[in-house]
Amino acid sequence: MSKVIPINPTHDFKERSRQVLNDPGQRKNFRGAMDFLQAKRRAQFVDQEELQGLRELGSQIRRYSLANLPRLLELLETRLTANGVQVHWAQSPDEANAIALGIAQRVDAKRIIKGKSMVSEEIGFNHAMEAAGIEAFESDMGEYIVQLAGEAPSHIIMPAIHKTKQEIARLFADEVPGVSYTEDVDALIAIGRKVLRRKFADADIGLSGVNFCVAETGTLCLVENEGNGRMCTTVPKVHIAITGIEKVLEKLEHVPPLVSLLTRSATGQSVTTYVNMISGPRKPGEKDGPQEVHLILLDNGRTQAYADEELRATLQCIRCGACMNHCPVYARIGGHAYGTTYPGP
């Protein structure tokens, strides 16, 4: 049976909610951001029949995947192994971190560059690596901002959505050497890009999440907008991907409908800037790509949810974040009030 990370018993939801509700500026920021994201999603789904049809198709695919989960996970491991990917199974956060740490120590890694991964937040990956003397550096711009601030993400898609432009400007001026205060958004992005490019060049390992695993072909699908995911998975000599066991699909043809739902619902885009399909490490004769690819499949209570007929439906989630964007409670108090990795009522 999995060891499940408990909700932080010292976290006071009522007190944290009260603090946010007593801050008019923060309430205004949350409300404005949620209104903006809702409008972008509506613009993508003008035709309600199309929306309902796509949602039903996506639901059918996810229900089918979960109904066949044990078989698909076995097939995924077989195909990935044949492709040269090393597959690891982790029952708990401690086990997942131990696997990653073992890989890092074997290759004498000192620096890990990270793409966006909520599962890495779920297991406390950064703290585990830092405790072992290994730097874990976020490369997603939002994650980089909250890491600089010493905070957790407040939204599963937009980690720093609770930060104002002025707060980010002050954070960069205080925490990034040689940077002066500026509220120019393009300048702030350029500063972040310059720092991150150096980190990519110095990294020994790249860590990423996975949006979907395709069992039939042994493929890891990763969607993103900044290009940092592609850099994390191709520049370092070792790539470690980590995801929950529920993310498996049977066929490649199941990916496009779910990616369409994900991107249009999450950020109001027809498709993300980058769609990465990873099916193994660098082959002989190839000039780029990692020499090793590892996949850590995390349980952490998912098999318990799978065994419960009612809870099993929660495993269909594709992590688009639209429920948070439309939640009247979240829009008023944000994600930090909950004290959990995946916030919301």
What positions do the PLM features span?
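Gly-rich Lys/Arg/Thr-decorated short loops/hinges at beta-loop-alpha junctions or inter-strand turns
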Residues: 52-60, 74-83, 167-179, 235-236, ...
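Conserved alpha/beta enzyme-core scaffold
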Residues: 95, 107, 113-213
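Generic secondary-structure signature for well-ordered alpha-helical cores
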Residues: 74, 78-86, 105, 130, ...
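N-terminal leader/transition segments
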Residues: 1-117, 121-132, 140
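Conserved phosphate- and dinucleotide-binding cores of soluble alpha/beta proteins
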Residues: 193, 198-281, 286
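A glycine-rich phosphate-binding loop feature that marks nucleotide/adenosyl-phosphate handling sites
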Residues: 95, 272-285, 319, 330-334, ...
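Short, glycine-/Ser/Thr-/acidic-enriched flexible segments
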Residues: 94-95, 118-119, 143-144, 163, ...
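Ferredoxin-type iron-sulfur electron-transfer modules in oxidoreductases and energy-metabolism complexes
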Residues: 285-314, 324-325, 329-345
